[in-house]
Amino acid sequence: AARYHSLIAQEVGLPDCLKITARDETGQIMAVQHKQFPVFGVQFHPESVLTEVGGQILKNLLDYLNDLRRNSPKTALKSYLAQVVEGKDLTRQQAEQVMNILMSGQAEESQIGSFLTALRMKGETIEEITGLASGMRKKALAVRGSTDAIDIVGTGGDLSNSFNISTTSAFVVAGAGGRVAKHGNRSVSSRCGAADVLEALGVKIDLTPDQARECLEKIGVSFLFAQSFHRSMRFVGPTRKQIGIRTVFNILGPLTNPASTEYIVLGVYAPELVHPIAQVMSNLGVKRALIVYGTDRLDEISITAPTLVCQVEGDQVSQPFEVTP
C-alpha cells in the first residue's frame, strides 16, 4: 500500500502484519507491505507516477504481479471438476463462475480437457449451459447497438460434410433487406467453419466492433469472427483442438453472439438438443428464435427431410414440432 500525500502513517501502533517498505528522506513512512498476503494499493497521482521513476515504479509492480500469477498454482477449477466427475450438476451461478475461471487463464490445459470431457459424459443441463453462456457473453468484446439484427448459425459437428449453409443464408437474408450479424469461427470439430469459407473468398474477417457495426449498417450483413471478439477463448482453444471431440463449446458459440442479437435461427447437431437449447435462449433474454434440426442429420433446416423445430417468443418456448420441405 502506498501512502497518499495528505495522510501520515505512524510507526507506533503499526499492525504486526505490516512491514515498512519505503520511507522518504525525512524518515516518514511512504509504503507498507502485508507480510502474508499479496495486497497492493496503487495511486495514479502526478506527484508520483509522472516523476522520473514513476514509470519504473508501475513496471516493478506489474512485473511482480505477473510473476505472482504465473507461479501460483491453478486450483480454482478443481472443486467444480470433482463435482462434475461425480455426476453432480452445477448451478447456473457455479457454471458462470467456471466460465470465468476458464476465460481468465486460471486452469491448466489438463484440467480444462478433463472438465469438458466429464461435462459431456454427464450431460449438460439447461442451467449449466445458461450459466456458461452468460459468463462467456460477459467476457466478449461487444458490438453495441445491433441487438435488432438476426444471427443465422449452427453448432457444427453434425458430421454431414455439408457446405456452410448458414453463412450462405446470411447473404440471402441481407439481400432480402434483413440485417444479419453473423457470428462464426474456424472449424474445430466439423469440416468447414464460417470463417474458413469467408477467408477463402477474400473477406476480411478480423473486424473491430466499430467496423463490424459499420458493415451491418451499410450492407446489412457483418461477420463477427469469434477469435476476434472472444479473445479469452485463447485459454480454451488449444485444448478443444487437442481433444477433437464435441464439447459444450459447440453449443456455446451460437449462444454468445457479441452483438447480443435478440433474433436467431440456430441449428443443432442432435434432436435431443432442440428443446433444451430453446429454453436456454429464453433464459438469455432472446426475443424470438427458431432452434432447428434436420432429421437427415443436419444442423440446418433440411430441404430433403422433415425438420424438428422449437420456437422461442420471449419467455414462451413451444414444444418441438416438424416442418417439411
Say what each PLM segment does.
Residues Q56, T75-A76, D89-Q97, Q106-S114, ...:
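Conserved active-site and cofactor/substrate-binding residues in soluble primary-metabolism enzymes
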Residues S146-V153, A181-S187, F249-L252:
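Core alpha/beta catalytic barrel or barrel-like domain that forms the active/cofactor pocket
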Residues P73-N161, A176:
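Acidic, glycine/proline-rich low-complexity segments that act as flexible tails and inter-domain linkers
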Residues K138-L141, S162, G177, E199-D206, ...:
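Glycine-rich anion-binding loops and their surrounding alpha/beta cores
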Residues Q111-I112, A181-H183, I291:
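Short beta-strand segments at enzyme active-site cores
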Residues L116, F163-I219:
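A glycine-rich phosphate/pyrophosphate-binding beta-strand-loop-alpha-helix module
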Residues G154-L159, G184-S190, F229, T295-D296:
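Acidic, glycine-rich active-site loops and adjacent beta-strand->loop/helix elements
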